[in-house]
Amino acid sequence: MEHLLQFVWKHKLFPLTPLHTTQGQTVEVIDPGLPNSDAGPDFFNAKIKIDGILWVGNVEIHVHASDWKRHHHHQDRAYDSVILHVSSDIDTETFRTDGTPIPQMELHYPPYLLDNYRELIETSHYPACYRLIPRLPKLLLHSWLSSLQTERFEQKTQRIQAQLTQSKGDWEQAFFLTLARNFGFGTNSDAFEQWAQTIPLQAVNKHRDNLFQIEAIFFGQAGLLQELPSDDYSAQLTKEYAYLAHKFELQPSEHLRWKMLRMRPGNFPHVRIAQLANLYHRSQGMLSQLLLASTVKELRDLLRGGTSLYWLTHYVFGESSPARPKTLSDASIDLLIINTVVPFLYAYGKHKGEEQLTERAGNLLEQLKPENNYIIRLWKECGLQAAHAGDSQALIQLKKNYCDTKKCLFCRIGYEYFKKKEG
């Protein structure tokens, strides 16, 4: 309920009748202040007139005034800057660390706000606001989706920064970790990322002109080369891997759980690893080349890939199948662009301070079709249809970061829902 009070305060949704402190002083809220998501008072730099005198400082909000002492604010100097304590239940006085009293105001709001809040939080419908969406202005929805897309970019940038730290600042290595994870296409993503963490790109680069040796490193580190090879090709790879493992002091992954049950053969980890090996055989500095590409076609051509001849007739070692090229489909390539290339382009642009790179990241998403998954289909049923991949990324962000966590108070659609007075 405290979040609701903060929401009411932030948007000044309380009655406009004269406000007073518990001591009878008049209160005029000039500026409610900036919300604070970290430790300290709830709102910074508020501007409030108390009995005609302008005060600039912080505001703290509680359901009960006694929460001030319960949270030990009376012993925390970070709260000495509070100029007004706002509660829906003033059940005690509040004091700063030096013993001086803090002006308090009881905050009331229309009953429909609480009713709307309960509707959103307690309803079994998903999303709870689905009835309102078709009635909202398109400009409002477009603006919200644009903000969500940027928010998703920033969130992915944080993950990339974590990968960079793990890779000791090596952008190519960090890119490989992310690309490998996304080559798992959900089902094997964790296994692919764990596998990629064991692959030193310096070793791969030294043998980049030899696809067979790259495959030996990749399959060996994946733990997919058996002690008793199932055919001549896997036997040759096993022998080559033993040599390269000794040369580069490689240790194969021991606890990877590759999933293949109820999976299309084209998605088997063997095929995906063979495709990755081919990509790194053909490209010197994969990230560098992708960053230079300015169109979706160029990116698709770089990522199209393929495999060595062996995999034209195999999905796993030792089991022949009718000959079929194992190239990535446009849909799969587009997912790699959306989830790997574009976030790295944005993150690299932020890192270098090159705005044209961050803008290109957004432009590339607008050139791609929206993703087709259950989240996007859900929003379409509610009246929110993605026009391009930028929109679909925004809608994924909306569901995962707002709807699933019931953060309706922080959502622009939720804000419109709270304000509505009709049922």
Give short role names for the model-derived ranges.
Residues M1-Q6:
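N-terminal "leader" segments that precede or initiate the main folded domain
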Residues V82, V86-W144:
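Compact, glycine/acidic-enriched structural inserts
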